[in-house]
Design a protein with these regions (language model features):
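Alpha-helical protein-protein interaction elements
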Residues: 21-24, 47-48, 54, 128, ...
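N-terminal single-pass transmembrane signal-anchor helix
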Residues: 1-49
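Periplasmic/extracellular, small/polar-rich flexible segments of pilin-like filament-forming proteins
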Residues: 57-161
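Membrane-proximal N-terminal amphipathic helix
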Residues: 34-64, 70-73
């Protein structure tokens, strides 16, 4: 007797293997998508990082002036565009905050194609000039601790942790 084709058990094994691979690959791909969207924010913030570093080198301190109460005034003093003009496919705005040179990156909504764990959340770039040169680190919130209502730390780029 000459059999051609696959038996039912062979087909079931192949389907099970594909299911296991998909169960591992799909969440990893979703993490990859979220991380690339956050990386766009880091890239868009590079102009603000440079402007704040130049301001610090010229004035010996970060922009922390009470007379510059609005984001537009702070951006003008730094020579940056309006916060909402510094945007991208996933990033709503990049803003120089009042707090000692901090930069806040805010993401668009799910309706704009942003990953659900990134949508409408923000992260901060916090400068450290204690060793003569400026280094930047990322944080989820003002305290640096990440909570469920903020961007999860696993999505922050490893280059700024």
């Amino acid at each position: 007797m000459n059999h051609k084709g696959f038996t039912l058990i062979e087909l079931m094994i192949v389907v099970a293997i594909i299911g296991i691979l998909a169960a591992v690959a799909i969440p990893q791909y979703q993490n990859y998508v979220a991380r690339t969207q956050v990386a766009e924010g880091l890239s868009l913030a590079s102009g603000a990082k440079t402007a704040l570093a130049e301001y610090y080198n010229t004035n010996g301190e970060f922009l922390n002036n009470a007379s510059l109460s609005g984001a537009a005034a702070r951006h003008e003093a730094l020579g940056l565009a309006e916060p909402t003009d510094i945007s991208g496919k996933y990033v709503m705005k990049v803003k120089a905050a009042k707090n000692d040179g901090m930069i806040v990156v805010t993401f668009k909504s799910v309706a704009d194609g942003v990953h659900k764990d990134v949508a409408e959340k923000e992260f901060r770039l916090i400068p450290d000039a204690s060793e003569g040169s400026i280094s930047w680190r990322c944080a989820c919130g003002l305290s640096g601790a990440c909570t469920s209502s903020q961007l999860l730390e696993k999505y922050l780029p490893s280059s700024c942790l």
